[in-house]
């Protein structure tokens, strides 16, 4: 998965495609995914247009991780992708809306410690139990809000360490939570049902 350079920005979709092609050609035997996350890169080109232009330029293009809350753009992109490209949804707090729009799956950071929350949400959606799916999506939103209160990246890493997967701290300039913050977070997550849907620690 490849994210666009965060300093120099392409002027148009064609420039983005050329940049991705230069990266993809370095590993032609591997599937190439472009990571579309405008909130971080400050670059927002239509993914459907990217797919059309990249289809003849990047032979190993497999899809795009779509991390953008614009469901209209997502539907357009799914239509452009057809069965040829994979477009996993990337905003955990809006998975239910994406499923209704046509998502077939997602790639999310909070899936690491809340796997059953999301598999249960997807299962509820697929059986038509929207009440349960909405409740689980609300839980996801509350969980993300709780983690974000002390800095999402650093707190996510600290939570993973508490669950037995030490991925190290966040690097500066990002902040890391104190042990007290992490203890308070775990209590908050338990109040949201973490013991039912969260990952199990050692």
Question: Residue ranges of each PLM-predicted region?
Answer:
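Catalytic alpha/beta core domains of metabolic enzymes, predominantly
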Residues: 24-30, 38-148
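Short, small-residue-enriched loops and turns at beta-alpha junctions
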Residues: 7-13, 38-44, 72, 174-176
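C-terminal alpha-helical cap/extension of soluble enzyme domains
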Residues: 103, 110, 114-202
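Short, small-residue-biased leader/transition segments that mark boundaries at the very start
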Residues: 1-3
